[in-house]
Amino acid sequence: MGQTLAEKILSHKVGRPVRAGELVVVEVDQVMVVDSIAGSFFKRLEYLEATPRYPERVSIVIDHVAPAANLEVAKAQKEIREWGKRHGIRVFDVGRGVCHQVLIEEGLAQPGWVVVGSDSHSTTYGAVGAFGTGMGATDIALAAASGRTWLRVPESVKVVFRGRLPKGVTAKDAALEMVRLLTAEGATYMAVEIHLLDGAEALTRGERMTLANLTVEAGAKAGLVVPSGEILEMYRVPDWLYPDPDARYAKEVEIDLSALTPRVSVPFYVDNVHEVAQVKGKRVDQVFIGTCTNGRIEDLRAAAEVLRGRKVAPWVRLLVVPASSQVLEEAARDGTLLTLLEAGATIGTPGCGPCMGRHMGVLAPGEVCVSTSNRNFRGRMGAPDAEIYLASPRVAAASAVAGYLTTPEELEEEEVHA
């Protein structure tokens, strides 16, 4: 019986063939710690009377509340900088960007690696063929102290995307459709193994990041995109880093990209996904474009394309937060930033922004937000009764202009008949 991609990677780390269900101890190639967990991480290491065994394999990213929103956070971030300097640990400071975007830009996630992070969306690293998974402060501290971690080899779900995306449809729409089909608990502690076939292999690294990012919303332990397309040009992909044809899967799902339409996830569950056409017209107070899901340069360009020559509705706050300083620089160079500003957008410091509801756009009671992020749970961005609709940058931009949930195509049609 052949092996899945998850089994291949973990077998390579263990040094022998492993199967789903086995408990294994594996070498960790990179440990990622975010600012909001750093304090707990330090305390766990202190309790263990340990320091990072391989300092070069540990990165701390100040992104969740950046810049500091209050004195308490400012003190915590000061401690991060001092601790990093004291132990020779790499610290990506305020403004560098969202942890997952930064690690991939910096080459700190590579095909075949095991990357553990103190953020649930560490599945994003699977876009480049790495086994990325999120863990709590204790497990992260143990991984940093020992250079290893333990886990149960996950079963795998095979998700096959075929064809090419139609005009106006994005990888975010494909990712939301995937979560709808798998359901919120349909891949609990499984590796979602994504195959791109019959034209789908043309998806960019950024688009693959969106797919891998959202696998955790189906409960996934890891989200692994089988290397193809531009990944083969950008990285040195080992010959062994492919699933076997006779690998065994817990379930299989197939999605025809060419048949997709714009999607939206409706409060308060990510898998509550509908066609935008079914729920359009909902009045919007805030639109947020950014995060580790959709804050890359292609996302900002897609939004700018919709916003060019238009203005944001008077009652809408449009917040755009680039996923990294590199993205911000590219947007400034090619005119994307100017287009966003001319439309009425407010540009935030590269990082997580208002995604988790701690600063930079907290929602008031009863407010509605269209967001390109990955979670719309009750209270996620502020008030418990505030509503978050998850959508693509194109749908988010069109909704900002219209003042209600809509698509660029619907917006254009209404403008023609106005």
Curated annotation (Swiss-Prot):
It is an enzyme of class 4 (lyase). Keywords: 4Fe-4S, Amino-acid biosynthesis, Iron, Iron-sulfur, Lyase, Lysine biosynthesis, Metal-binding. One of its GO terms (molecular function) is metal ion binding. It comes from Thermus thermophilus (strain ATCC BAA-163 / DSM 7039 / HB27). GO terms for biological process: L-leucine biosynthetic process; lysine biosynthetic process via aminoadipic acid. Its EC number is 4.2.1.36. This is Homoaconitase large subunit. It holds the Pfam family Aconitase. Is not inhibited by lysine. Catalyzes the reversible hydration of cis-homoaconitate ((Z)-but-1-ene-1,2,4-tricarboxylate) to homoisocitrate ((1R,2S)-1-hydroxybutane-1,2,4-tricarboxylate). Can catalyze neither the dehydration of (R)-homocitrate ((2R)-2-hydroxybutane-1,2,4-tricarboxylate) into cis-homoaconitate in vitro, nor the reverse reaction. Is not active toward (S)-homocitrate, cis-aconitate or citrate as substrate. Heterodimer of HacA and HacB. Transmembrane segments: none annotated. Binds 1 [4Fe-4S] cluster per subunit. [4Fe-4S] cluster binds at residues 292, 352, 355. Pathway: Amino-acid biosynthesis; L-lysine biosynthesis via AAA pathway; L-alpha-aminoadipate from 2-oxoglutarate: step 3/5. It catalyses: (2R,3S)-homoisocitrate = cis-homoaconitate + H2O. The gene is hacA. Optimum pH is 8.0. Belongs to the aconitase/IPM isomerase family. Its cofactor is [4Fe-4S] cluster.
